[in-house]
Every structure is written in structure tokens, then in C-alpha cells.
Amino acid sequence: SPDKGLTWMTIDTGYPGSLWSGIKADVGIYLLLGMSGNIIIAKELDPNAEEPSADKFTGLGCFEGGMYDGDCKVFTFEYQNIGVKNSLTNAIILDDGRIAISGNSGTVSIVDLYNKKNIETCVRSDRLSNTSIVNLGNDEFLIAGQKGVRKHSMSQCYENFVSDDPALQDSYYTVDLS
């Protein structure tokens, strides 16, 4: 909504599942967070300058009333999965443009649309559901949810994943977006 919620448009994303949250990632780029680890990358197109990609679902939405009545937007939707089947609950934009996402069953993901063009996902060994995430800097976060607030480090999760110590049970996944 461009007018702080006074008017809305409904757009068919083509996604059959539930969406739990969303975030504006950049000008004309939005991430929609869904169930089972699914992310929809929605890109707003300028219909006078860009042709929609044939391999992506395209949606059209128009405002119906208010000061934007009749204003229409064209979006393409790219479906991605973070590498695991855990629902996603919250997202924040980091200082460098990446997106940090919290999710159920210990999931923390970092989406990099521009540099690495990937999604890195940690599934914490505690498997506690996370409902929100706060950036502490240096790839460290506060995650809140089941059983309170915890500090999380993506680099520590990766070190735990590659460790030979059987007591460390974190999992780490990388999905290529290019």
C-alpha cells in the first residue's frame, strides 16, 4: 500500500500455500515468506519498459478505490526454497542489503540477492521456533520465540556443522539463486 494502508490491491502470486510475512527488499523487490521454507521473490515491472519473463508467474493488480483507484502494477514471482521445510516467520534488511529470516524449528536464513546470489540456512540444534530476528552486527542476531530470546551466530552454526564433534548438531544449507 503506497498510502500507509488506506488502499490495497490483491495480486495472485500463483503460490498455493500460506504466506506468513513479507518485506520490501529493495525498490520494486519484495520477499514473501511462506510455509515449508518457501520464499517468493516478487519483482515489480515497468510494463512500458520490461517484458515479463516467460519462466516466471506474472500477476497484475489494480487499486480499487481511494487516491490510487485504477493504478495497476505488474509483478513477476520467482519461487525459491531455503533448503529445508520449516515455515518462515519474520525478516529484516541488513546494512549490506542482505535479508535475515527467522523461522520455525530453529531456522535462521540469510538471503543475498546481489553478491553471493544465494540463501544460507542454519537449522539450530535446539530446534526451537523463532518468531522474530534482530541484527546485532557481524552476522550475529537475537532471535525470539519459543522459550524466550537467544543469541545466534551464522558463522558458529557453520563451524558446528562442519565439526567432527558429534555433540554439535547444527545443520547448514546453501541454495544457489543464480
Model-derived features: positions:
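Residue-level hotspots at or immediately adjacent to binding/recognition sites across diverse folds
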Residues: 1-178
